[in-house]
């Protein structure tokens, strides 16, 4: 049933893409097209729910195992088997992908211009079908092709719908970084095919131990570097910062919410799944690199002014904590890493949704330009606060469960690495609450600029509310001739919108908050799908 569901998903998304392309003939009304797209996402959610039910308590290791609840269908082409297999881990990531795409559809209704909305929806659907096929792939060549193809719609989204002047540079940078990393991944696949004569994942798992130790190490390093770019691990993280700053809201949500998880999923399948002994061997090196990344990005976050860069650095820090958990080789660490990947997907995705809404209203992302928005956007203030709690791993949130399990696993593995990685929680709490306070409450820098404005107007204003401050502080920014990243920019008064979230924005952000709380309050919802897989990873 699970493979039938994945096949139907591909057909449904294909029909949706065709429907969007032919919308002028089939759906001349823009409203009907949006209803059609949302209906497609609803069908996909139902199908992914069926997969989740069918995959609970399954693994991908042995096709004829009584624990397997799947069917694998192959078509042979040049000795490369192309097929699909779904287990608990891949099913839950597919579900996350569909939820995030739905949120992107909802958040883009207002901000994407009508004349380009058709092309934008096609890019979202292409991203969705490629990511779903990545998580369901059983062949390494199939996986590599889909892995690379996910770049195409993302590069187009950033290059065409990006919000800044350097969007084309960002699109080129993400392309170059990922392609260079993929060379190492392709090298590992080539070695596997030349030595074992197959690229089928199940067959490789069965015979991987017969390879010489040096060959196995070379394959391991190739996969590690290839997926490290996507995580990303410092110093391979530079592409992500520019990509987030330049990307449209939906692009940032997909980058943080699911595309970074391709690297984590790759580690689970092709590093930990194939070489658990080498994970143990290289853990001190991997742990040291991740610790440097965690501490560096945490401290760097405190120096940022662009709110997107703040969340981007936070995202890198969390992903490196995930890598520590996955490579710990301890059951709790691996389970925590997977749960935190899901939690990070909804929390960071939700934060980027919030930032996109605020940017749509205020036309700036520089943190000092915001002040007292709680009076103008009270609902947004509540949603943002809940997501901040998730970002700092507050109890009853998904990130709390994931980080707790990771640190339990790290304590069992290496107490020193566990101690220093735990410092990231303190740093995360500092910049998360600092960011929230800067956006929604009064800060001293804005007070000084506001007082200058008040003095120049000769007015006495007791309540320096957000409506007044956004307009006049932005005028002062215009006088100084700077924008979010130090480049000339003109912000017109008529561009500013003073309103809280609309129904589409509220729904998209609420989906993230609800998933975060459900996983946090009942982690067994996720553990039921991944437990057998994690046990298998540590027992190989």
From Swiss-Prot:
Protein name: NADH-ubiquinone oxidoreductase chain 4
Catalytic function, reaction form: a ubiquinone + NADH + 5 H(+)(in) = a ubiquinol + NAD(+) + 4 H(+)(out)
E.C. number(s) listed in UniProt: 7.1.1.2
GO MF entries: NADH dehydrogenase (ubiquinone) activity; ubiquinone binding
GO biological process terms on file: aerobic respiration; ATP synthesis coupled electron transport; electron transport coupled proton transport
InterPro entries referenced in this protein's UniProt entry, alphabetically: NADH_Q_OxRdtase_chainM/4 (IPR010227), NADH_UbQ_OxRdtase (IPR003918), ND/Mrp_TM (IPR001750)
Family: Belongs to the complex I subunit 4 family.
Pfam families: Proton_antipo_M (PF00361)
Gene Ontology CC entries for this record: mitochondrial membrane; respiratory chain complex I
Organism whose genome encodes this protein: Dictyostelium discoideum
Coiled coil: none
Function summary: Core subunit of the mitochondrial membrane respiratory chain NADH dehydrogenase (Complex I) that is believed to belong to the minimal assembly required for catalysis. Complex I functions in the transfer of electrons from NADH to the respiratory chain. The immediate electron acceptor for the enzyme is believed to be ubiquinone.
UniProt membrane topology term: Multi-pass membrane protein
Residues annotated as transmembrane: 2-22, 35-55, 89-109, 118-138, 140-160, 172-192, 218-238, 248-268, 282-302, 310-330, 338-358, 376-396, 415-435, 501-521
Swiss-Prot/TrEMBL keywords: Electron transport, Membrane, Mitochondrion, NAD, Respiratory chain, Translocase, Transmembrane, Transmembrane helix, Transport, Ubiquinone
Location in the cell: Mitochondrion membrane
């Amino acid at each position: 049933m699970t493979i039938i569901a994945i096949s139907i998903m591909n057909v449904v998304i294909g029909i949706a893409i065709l429907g969007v392309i032919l919308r002028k003939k089939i759906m001349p009304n823009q409203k009907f097209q949006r209803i059609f797209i949302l209906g497609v996402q609803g069908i996909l959610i139902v199908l992914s729910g069926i997969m989740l039910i069918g995959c609970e308590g399954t693994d991908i290791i042995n096709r004829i195992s009584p624990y397997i609840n799947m069917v694998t269908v192959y078509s042979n082409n040049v000795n490369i088997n192309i097929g699909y297999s779904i287990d608990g881990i891949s099913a839950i990531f597919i579900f996350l992908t569909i939820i995030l795409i739905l949120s992107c559809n909802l958040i883009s209704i207002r901000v994407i211009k009508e004349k380009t909305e058709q092309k934008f929806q096609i890019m979202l659907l292409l991203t969705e079908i490629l990511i779903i096929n990545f998580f369901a792939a059983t062949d390494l060549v199939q996986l590599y092709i889909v892995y690379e193809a996910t770049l195409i719609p993302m590069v187009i989204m950033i290059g065409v719908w990006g919000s800044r002047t350097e969007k084309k540079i960002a699109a080129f940078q993400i392309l170059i970084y990922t392609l260079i990393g993929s060379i190492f991944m392709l090298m590992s696949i080539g070695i596997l095919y030349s030595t074992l004569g197959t690229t089928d994942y199940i067959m490789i798992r069965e015979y991987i131990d017969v390879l010489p130790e040096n060959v196995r190490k070379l394959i391991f390093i190739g996969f590690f570097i290839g997926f490290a770019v996507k995580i990303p691990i410092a110093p391979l993280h530079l592409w992500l910062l520019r990509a987030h700053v330049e990307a449209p809201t939906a692009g940032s949500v997909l980058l943080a919410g699911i595309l970074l998880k391709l690297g984590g999923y790759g580690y689970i399948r092709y590093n930990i799944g194939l070489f658990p002994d080498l994970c143990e061997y290289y853990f001190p090196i991997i742990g040291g690199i991740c610790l440097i990344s965690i501490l560096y990005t945490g401290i760097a976050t405190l120096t940022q002014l662009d709110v997107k860069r703040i969340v981007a650095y936070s995202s890198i820090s969390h992903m490196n904590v995930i890598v520590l958990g996955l490579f710990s080789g301890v059951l709790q660490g691996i389970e925590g890493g997977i749960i935190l990947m899901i939690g990070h997907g909804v929390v960071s995705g939700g934060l980027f949704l919030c930032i996109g809404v605020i940017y749509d209203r205020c036309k700036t992302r520089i943190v000092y330009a915001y002040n007292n928005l709680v009076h103008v956007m009270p609902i947004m203030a509540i949603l943002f606060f809940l997501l901040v709690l998730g970002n700092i791993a507050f109890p009853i949130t998904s990130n709390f469960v994931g980080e707790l399990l990771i640190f339990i696993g790290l304590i069992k593995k290496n107490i020193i690495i566990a101690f220093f990685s735990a410092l990231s929680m303190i740093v995360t709490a500092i910049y998360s609450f600092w960011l929230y306070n800067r956006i929604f409450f009064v800060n001293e820098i804005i007070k000084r600029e506001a007082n200058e404005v008040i003095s120049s107007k000769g007015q006495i204003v007791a309540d320096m509310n957000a409506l007044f401050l956004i307009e006049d502080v932005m005028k002062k920014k215009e006088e100084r001739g700077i924008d979010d990243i130090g480049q000339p920019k003109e912000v017109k008064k008529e561009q500013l919108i003073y309103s809280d979230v609309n129904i589409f924005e509220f729904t998209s952000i609420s989906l993230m908050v609800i998933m975060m709380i459900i996983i946090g309050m009942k982690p067994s919802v996720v553990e039921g799908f991944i437990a057998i897989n994690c046990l298998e990873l540590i027992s190989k």
